[in-house]
From Swiss-Prot:
GO biological process, any: translation
Pfam families cross-referenced by the UniProt entry: KOW
Originating organism: Pyrococcus horikoshii (strain ATCC 700860 / DSM 12428 / JCM 9974 / NBRC 100139 / OT-3)
Keywords recorded for this protein, A-Z: Ribonucleoprotein, Ribosomal protein
Gene behind this protein: rpl14e
Native organism taxonomy: Archaea, Methanobacteriati, Methanobacteriota, Thermococci, Thermococcales
Entry protein name: Large ribosomal subunit protein eL14
HAMAP family, A to Z: Ribosomal_eL14
């Protein structure tokens, strides 16, 4: 299983957004991360428990705490769609 780190693409496996992809933007502590869908899907920028995420092998190069615009640009550059 890939590591939980900034820029990692993940699939939400619990809650009403289950099945949707998101990008990990920041690591809050050992249990929570900040995720976003960068306006490309219905996932809003929010705190999420890492137990509710399944990390994927894809990763984009973004700084910690990147804005949605930076995330969207990095996704387009890498050719990854959410």
């Amino acid at each position: 299983m890939p590591a939980i780190d900034v820029g990692r693409i993940a699939v939400i496996i619990a809650g009403r957004r289950a099945g949707q992809k998101c990008v990990i933007v920041d690591i809050i502590d050992k249990n929570f991360v900040l995720v976003t869908g960068a306006g490309l899907n219905k996932v809003k920028r929010r705190r999420m428990n890492i137990k509710h995420l399944e990390p994927l092998p894809e990763k984009i190069d973004i700084p910690r705490g990147a804005s949605d615009e930076e995330v969207k640009a990095a996704l387009e550059k890498a050719g990854i769609s959410l």
